[in-house]
């Protein structure tokens, strides 16, 4: 049987950026890697209901900068920025260095593989029929401009005695084309029958400029907790 390489891993440095960008010498590398793992584990647990897509980590000059990409920034920031301040203190304590937290909004959650996979998994846990959940996700993605999408679920589907896999695809998903912008992610649905795995591939088009084009597109400033405006008038 032909096996598939991880679509994100093979595209790192070609059209996909790294989730952790820092340099460390031999002594500090293991500590930094362990710190990144613990920070991500903590934030994913705390923000389980905040539709978090991915968490990027930078380490400039004995500090840590965490960017949380989420479809619901209001939940992460909290009332007057209280929640994000608690997260900042907790991350600083875990990493052992001063922390800064930025929030980046995911404008189209229907085109984000992680959020789509989480959505399908939560529907399966609520006993929605798996075919209906898959088709709904595919239709929403194609409606919002995806060039192609593939969804696969595997496990005891519908409470069947024998586990199996089913998939549904629409459009193109060219896994062999390295310049193709393919977003891939997974999720798990914990049902009464057992665990059902969900995999999502979303093809958004081809990136012709390589990493330079990717970096340019990601230069939009991350959202910060906003203060209430003083005046009511508009310019």
UniProtKB/Swiss-Prot annotation:
Q: Which family does it belong to?
A: Belongs to the universal ribosomal protein uS3 family.
Q: What does this protein do?
A: Binds the lower part of the 30S subunit head. Binds mRNA in the 70S ribosome, positioning it for translation.
Residue span(s) of domain KH type-2: 39-107
Protein name, please?
Small ribosomal subunit protein uS3
Top-level taxon: Bacteria
Record text on subunit structure and interactions: Part of the 30S ribosomal subunit. Forms a tight complex with proteins S10 and S14.
Species per Swiss-Prot/TrEMBL record: Actinobacillus pleuropneumoniae serotype 5b (strain L20)
Q: Which UniProt keywords apply?
A: Ribonucleoprotein, Ribosomal protein, RNA-binding, rRNA-binding
